[in-house]
Amino acid sequence: MFNRTTQLKSKHPCSVCTRRKVKCDRMIPCGNCRKRGQDSECMKSTKLITASSSKEYLPDLLLFWQNYEYWITNIGLYKTKQRDLTRTPANLDTDTEECMFWMNYLQKDQSFQLMNFAMENLGALYFGSIGDISELYLRVEQYWDRRADKNHSVDGKYWDALIWSVFTMCIYYMPVEKLAEIFSVYPLHEYLGSNKRLNWEDGMQLVMCQNFARCSLFQLKQCDFMAHPDIRLVQAYLILATTTFPYDEPLLANSLLTQCIHTFKNFHVDDFRPLLNDDPVESIAKVTLGRIFYRLCGCDYLQSGPRKPIALHTEVSSLLQHAAYLQDLPNVDVYREENSTEVLYWKIISLDRDLDQYLNKSSKPPLKTLDAIRRELDIFQYKVDSLEEDFRSNNSRFQKFIALFQISTVSWKLFKMYLIYYDTADSLLKVIHYSKVIISLIVNNFHAKSEFFNRHPMVMQTITRVVSFISFYQIFVESAAVKQLLVDLTELTANLPTIFGSKLDKLVYLTERLSKLKLLWDKVQLLDSGDSFYHPVFKILQNDIKIIELKNDEMFSLIKGLGSLVPLNKLRQESLLEEEDENNTEPSDFRTIVEEFQSEYNISDILS
């Protein structure tokens, strides 16, 4: 299943070559026997110079991890949701009634308290998406006037949807203690049909956040946004995307994002370069549109996958094609600050894109590409360290945290790739170092009473990548440093914000599953065929990818209408895997171990 990186050699010529009186290269199997198809006889007659070691199969395993990381920790956990065409159709009257409950639950004074929280703490998340943030208070006032007068228009509903997206963001990030000061939980008892007294720590904050997001989307539907497009659709979506909405509802989020891209291009606002003949209003508008564009590109990249074939971020070329090499030119200040934090965030994310493109590729990243990314990260680290930070302002501190966390994440991925593709001397030490940096950034937020910073979706995604890779690596390599790091990561995962909901539970399940694979690895002996290695753990990991790939193959659902023209196995994804298993030549006890583990720890349980 995994090949040797170096072919083994025997102490003496094989018996086949000795009998034939020909020169033997002493490889296992030797070249003569491979040509004559006598591999098995050759291998039986030889004695190995060295026993199997991790150095023989680890390079192949680490290359395999790239594919595993893409399909399991990225696509499977965050971007796959099974369509249920058998469920009861949506009842529009019920949807309206439920949304009206939550809209009536929010009172006027509470809405202004939410807006105050957004202004004082969450500016780094949405200021760039709004032209004039001071206008939001006026829009909230007008929202309540419209509700009192029952005077509605599409324009008003767009503002309502935008305002409710801000409310949703506030509910998501607000500390539970502050939420309890503003809202009473008792009106929700009857609505949710609960027999026990609820409090905000019982998952009620997540329920409230999800329903506030529904209210924002409900008002967008009332705008008939596909027939009457408006830039406020894009703004509302970008604000919702600062929560876990894109990962809770990946199919819906992808559809909305595609419509946002269409709307953005429909108004020809993707050309926001300043011109000499621009009047002051146009200049201000172009600045805002530029910020929206880069935020939209960031969302577009982070949601990219097999279920989202339409992309915007690909229209922006790699930073390495131009900016990375400007440092070799005279009179170029590579440390000059970007025009906005949105541009800074995008440039860092684009380096992440340059690395992650190799997750699902068989090609190897050139060493000069990795070195160029390393130089760029050093430049961005200097820029972020130089950012003015007002320690009294949560907006300023949150802005810097996001940038530092992004740089640390990309740095971790960079040295992981040095380890996988080039096994450089310091690569593992650097992976451990940046893992600790990421942990410290999160822990520092607890100490600084800024725990809500850790609710940013990027925190969950990064921890998923880090803890999964370290868990995987620890299966095959005994290292005290790696083992201790895994203990720290496991403890950190247990203390991540509960607002991450089911995704956090599924991450815990995935890490526990990898720890069970470690036990299986220690329990079952590795089979060595001379040129390949076999072990139930290898087979299980390979099957994991096949299962998630099949779950993302929509062809079976698109051909249902063809009836008897379609083979039955095409309508059952699982049968494709079963047919392949029937053709395997592994011993029966080997297959039994694999099947029992997959039955007890089904990888499909990480899916939504």
From Swiss-Prot:
DNA-binding region: 14-42
CDD domains the record matches: Cep3_C (cd12147), GAL4 (cd00067)
Main localisation: nucleus
GO molecular function, one term: zinc ion binding
SUPFAM superfamilies: Zn2/Cys6 DNA-binding domain
GO cellular component: CBF3 complex; kinetochore
Protein location: Nucleus; Chromosome, Centromere
Residues with PTM Phosphoserine: 575
A family per Pfam: Cep3
SMART domains (UniProt xref): GAL4
GO biological process: kinetochore assembly; mitotic spindle assembly checkpoint signaling; septin ring assembly
Protein keywords: Centromere, Chromosome, DNA-binding, Metal-binding, Nucleus, Phosphoprotein, Zinc
Tree of life domain: Eukaryota
Subunit composition and interactions: Component of the CBF3 copmplex, which is formed of CBF3A/CBF2, CBF3B/CEP3, CBF3C/CTF13 and CBF3D.
Other information: Present with 1900 molecules/cell in log phase SD medium.
Functional description taken from the UniProt entry: Acts as a component of the centromere DNA-binding protein complex CBF3, which is essential for chromosome segregation and movement of centromeres along microtubules. CBF3 is required for the recruitment of other kinetochore complexes to CEN DNA. It plays a role in the attachment of chromosomes to the spindle and binds selectively to a highly conserved DNA sequence called CDEIII, found in centromers and in several promoters.
Name the UniProt record assigns to this protein: Centromere DNA-binding protein complex CBF3 subunit B
Native source organism of the sequence: Saccharomyces cerevisiae (strain ATCC 204508 / S288c) (Baker's yeast)
Organism lineage string: Eukaryota, Fungi, Dikarya, Ascomycota, Saccharomycotina
